[in-house]
Amino acid sequence: IFDSSYSRGTTSDLILVSVIQGWREAMLTMSPGTIRRVEIPAPLAYKEIGSPPMIPPNATLTYEIELVSVLTPAEAIATATVLAANTIATPVPTPTPEGGYVVSDCDNSDYPETAPQFEDVTEDQYTTESSGIRVFDTKVGDGKNPDQNNRVDVHYTGWLASDGCVFDSSYTRG
């Protein structure tokens, strides 16, 4: 697991213009209540640079995203003080004696069994979008889709597509 709001035990509040291109494209066609699995190729994620030390160069990323709510810019400004007070720091990778970093134990032992699992969606369930992202909706919500200027409240888990290693999750943060 390299990223998951589930492991934090809380949703994450994001501004769509601040996320990677693949996330933005996936979110723009979601309605509140939708749960979407999305596979994002490297050119729409962190490209050849990666996001060291957690995400290697040219990594395809898999996310499960639950769109909880959409805030307009005015609503986001009205709640900005509350959001800032509730911000939780991103976990820092553990340094090794050799000067590198432990990316993850990759046994996902701290990832809750009740949270979405990497194996929950199979290859044949995905549909490829024109941008190159692949999506599968496990639940379809209703309501207004966000636009790129909205702030969204989401639950999510991010896996390295190559091995299912969780790199972040809202489910593991308290």
Protein language model regions, located:
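Cross-family detector of peptidyl-prolyl cis-trans isomerase
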Residues: 1-174
